């Protein structure tokens, strides 16, 4: 007898609910169809469902996301870095308390005491006809952040090696839910032939028909749930083995919306708006925001960052603020709207030479006009860099490009060999936006505060009537 086993999955929604009601309708329909046919079917999420960029996620600290997943009927989920490092310890500890699905993450640990009751290292599920399926999941080890929040992520390869032998002995099939990224997924497939399926996320890769590496089929469905993934396994009960593994992703953006989900989203948005409608200050004058110009609010915010982190200098890009603020009542919702990024303050150590190179790079048209989506940045462009504690003099070339002619502190040039503590947005410590910052061997992150928390303090101190 041949038995088909079905998995449907989502990954990296990032609280982008544009297509969520379509996702809900598609998944509920698929599950109902398989239940009618008496076929085994599970719904999975691979992490980063929560992202505090959205007011619903911000107001409910992720709890509304769990309600939405319950409504769809998810069976299993794992933790992404956006759940893991953007929520305070207590909020994450209780995030899944009301989940009607099992949460699996074998390398996630609480360093402050007992583990959350919802946390499973592995899970075993069973098909209608008795095929035992072992589920293991891992999340990306951003311990520089996690440890500041009272969590620890153990090394992925060591964790897999620890649990995979046990699963191999007790189950027929092993499914790995990976919030590690495509490169890690491929390497894990090469190292661990025991894995049959790797369902991935984190790096927002889209594999339309899956990819076979060693013994595993690897799959992932991009980001924001424009696609939903499906894995179909065929088990031969006579031969007692898998004889076929298939993986597909389906574009759901053209499908009809599930009206019940639409109503729930509207209800949650109204409630979130009410919760965020808490007055922060009253402003007598409107606040001007410009991405490519020096503004008072960006200068004040950069000054606050310098003082708050006790750094010698500070730098922030003007693109962090997305919109103007009118005169009158300013709520936390307004602050979230103009500064929605899950970005934390950070202090790095740079030599005088390195800092000057960073400053020069920041004034290039290429960086200022860079369209960025990622590293926590949820805006449009990087914009002009604003400095505190430094005087940066620039001139314009005949071609219209601006260049840095002089950098001083209290009228004196920077010592090229001296190390300075520079406060900035943590997004510059990732990737290659500003290589000197990314390569700094000394990085101190501040959690759970976001830059918008410093913005609220700045507005209270400098702009309140």
Where are these regions (language model features)?
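Residues in well-ordered beta-strands of folded domains
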Residues: 104, 219, 316, 393-395, ...
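Feature captures C-terminal
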Residues: 17, 326-465
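Structural signal for hydrophobic packing residues in well-ordered secondary-structure cores
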Residues: 27-34, 161-164, 168-171, 192, ...
């Amino acid at each position: 007898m041949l038995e088909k086993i079905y998995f449907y999955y989502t990954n990296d929604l990032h609280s982008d609910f544009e297509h969520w009601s379509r996702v809900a309708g598609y998944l509920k329909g698929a599950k109902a169809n398989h239940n009618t046919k008496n076929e085994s079917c599970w719904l999975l999420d691979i992490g980063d469902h929560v992202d505090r960029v959205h007011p619903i996620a911000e107001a409910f600290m992720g709890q509304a996301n769990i309600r939405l997943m319950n409504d769809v009927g998810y069976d299993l989920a794992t933790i992404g870095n956006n759940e893991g490092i953007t929520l305070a310890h207590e909020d994450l500890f209780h995030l899944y308390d009301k989940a009607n699905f099992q949460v699996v993450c074998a390398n996630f640990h609480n360093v402050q005491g007992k583990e959350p009751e919802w946390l499973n290292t592995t899970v075993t599920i069973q098909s209608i006809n008795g095929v035992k399926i072992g589920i293991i999941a891992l999340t990306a080890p951003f311990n520089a952040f996690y440890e500041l929040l009272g969590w620890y992520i153990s090394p992925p390869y060591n964790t897999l090696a620890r649990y995979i032998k046990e699963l191999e002995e007790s189950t027929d099939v092993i499914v790995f839910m990976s919030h590690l990224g495509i490169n890690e997924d491929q390497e894990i497939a090469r190292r661990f032939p025991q894995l049959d399926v790797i369902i991935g996320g984190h790096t927002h890769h889209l594999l339309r028909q899956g990819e076979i590496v060693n013994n595993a089929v690897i799959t992932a469905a991009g980001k924001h749930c424009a696609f939903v993934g499906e894995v179909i396994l065929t088990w031969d009960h006579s031969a007692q083995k898998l004889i076929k593994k298939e993986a597909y992703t389906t574009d759901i953006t053209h499908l009809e919306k599930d009206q019940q989900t639409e109503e729930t989203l509207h209800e949650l948005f109204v409630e979130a708006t009410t919760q965020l409608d808490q007055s922060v200050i009253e402003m007598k004058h409107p606040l001007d925001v410009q991405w490519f110009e020096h503004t008072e609010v960006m200068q004040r915010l950069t000054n606050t960052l310098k003082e708050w982190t006790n750094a010698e200098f500070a730098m922030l890009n003007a693109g962090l603020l997305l919109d103007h603020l009118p005169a009158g009542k300013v709520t936390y919702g307004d602050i979230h709207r103009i500064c929605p990024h899950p970005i934390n303050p950070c202090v790095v150590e740079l030599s005088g030479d390195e800092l000057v190179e960073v400053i020069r790079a920041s004034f290039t048209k290429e960086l200022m006009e860079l369209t960025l989506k990622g590293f926590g940045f949820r805006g449009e462009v990087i914009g002009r860099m604003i400095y505190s504690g430094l005087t940066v003099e620039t001139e314009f070339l005949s071609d219209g490009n601006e260049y840095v002619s002089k950098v001083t502190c209290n009228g004196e040039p920077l010592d090229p060999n001296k190390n300075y503590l520079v406060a900035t947005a943590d997004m510059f410590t990732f990737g290659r936006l500003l290589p000197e910052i990314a390569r700094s061997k000394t990085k101190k992150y501040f959690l759970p505060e976001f830059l918008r928390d410093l913005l609220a303090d700045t507005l209270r101190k400098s702009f309140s009537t």
